[in-house]
Amino acid sequence: MDRRVVITGIGGLCGLGTNAASIWKEMREGPSAISPIITTDLYDLEGTVGLEIKAIPEHDIPRKQLVSMDRFSLLAVIAATEAMKQAGLSCDEQNAHRFGAAMGLGGPGWDTIEETYRSILLDGVTRARIFTAPKGMPSAAAGHVSIFLGLRGPVFGVTSACAAGNHAIASAVDQIRLGRADVMLAGGSDAPLTWGVLKSWEALRVLAPDTCRPFSADRKGVVLGEGAGMAVLESYEHAAARGATMLAEVAGIGLSGDAYDIVMPSIEGPEAAMRSCLADAELNPDDVDYLNAHGTGTVANDEMETAAIKRVFGDHAFQMSVSSTKSMHAHCLGAASALEMIACVMAIQEGVIPPTANYREPDPQCDLDVTPNVPREQRCGSMSNAFAMGGTNAVLAFRQV
């Protein structure tokens, strides 16, 4: 069975805003909220920049569930609840087994791991807290979304570093296409702003000291953030039967592996994923008006991605709009491409392409139209790139229904 899959609700929170509407407002207007991290103890990393959620919005998650949740699970449940509310859906005994969830994340519960190490190694505590294992496991976000919303269909976590959000959405689309579910909540969540994670990224020598400047000649690296982005996916038939508002269609999926290096990017893997996505969506290269780039702000990644885009799109690469919204919401790892899904859906809805913020100097190696600093009004079909360490690549295509 091969069914069309549409998006009927979105939800999210990150340092730009605590719901999808406020995130999109900031993306559309183009400011960057990246600043020194203040809500966690950084010790020797004091002054490191990032994009943090300074206050969690109000929610009605019961305390009994909260005590077993890491921060990344909390963000996932809040975003998923918003998406379900916009979609106008709820679970009951009749439909729960046809509703599922696929949650992408970059790693385990970083907060839980750091808290445990500190309490035992520094504070002299002899035992870990009772919920340490279930709080920290990567699949916890999917489980908590399922528990809170009553989803009893396919429920699982997807861990593929920076491509996890797109991989989760792709996997959820497959569940619907194959008839295993009618509705899937899908996206990504991550809360990596802990001392241990930042220290690990510092060791890679890719953290920017000031801000994220994708494709700009003076770019200096990645800035990390935290957040979650979620979409309610439905079969077209299911959404139409209940008169739902369809925000966009997931038109195509492209997946690939580099089989090259654990950290260095290759051109061939991303190229293959983009070509596969176009083929799955039955699109020609010139059908794509907007490409939300992976665009991390590192020298190597941005040059590689530019070269791969040129290979796939040819002359059209110079005519379409490209931007990296990581310049605004930072790199939220497992949540990154899920937040970028929100950008693509809203770009289709409003006919506005979000800019690449913080852009200052053209780079001859990154010579595409990267929509520098100012949003652009343009009706568009869109694609979203996600290329992760380890060479795991996931590309999605979206179009108006």
Swiss-Prot record:
Keywords: Cell inner membrane, Cell membrane, Membrane, Nodulation, Plasmid, Transferase, Transmembrane, Transmembrane helix. Pfam families: ketoacyl-synt, Ketoacyl-synt_C. Residues 2-400 form the Ketosynthase family 3 (KS3) domain. Its EC number is 2.3.1.-. The active site is at C162 (for beta-ketoacyl synthase activity), H294 (for beta-ketoacyl synthase activity), H331 (for beta-ketoacyl synthase activity). It is found in: Cell inner membrane. It comes from the Bacteria. The chain crosses the membrane at residues 329-348. GO terms for cellular component: plasma membrane. GO terms for molecular function: 3-oxoacyl-[acyl-carrier-protein] synthase activity. SUPFAM superfamilies: Thiolase-like (SSF53901). The keyword Cell inner membrane applies. InterPro entries: Beta-ketoacyl_synthase, Ketoacyl_synth_AS, Ketoacyl_synth_C, Ketoacyl_synth_N, PKS_Beta-ketoAc_synthase_dom, Thiolase-like. GO terms for biological process: fatty acid biosynthetic process. PANTHER family: 3-OXOACYL-[ACYL-CARRIER-PROTEIN] SYNTHASE (PTHR11712:SF352), POLYKETIDE SYNTHASE-RELATED (PTHR11712). Proposed to synthesize NOD factor fatty acyl chain. Involved in the synthesis of a highly unsaturated fatty acid moiety, which forms part of a lipo-oligosaccharide that is responsible for host specificity. Belongs to the thiolase-like superfamily. Beta-ketoacyl-ACP synthases family. This is Nodulation protein E. It comes from Rhizobium leguminosarum bv. trifolii.
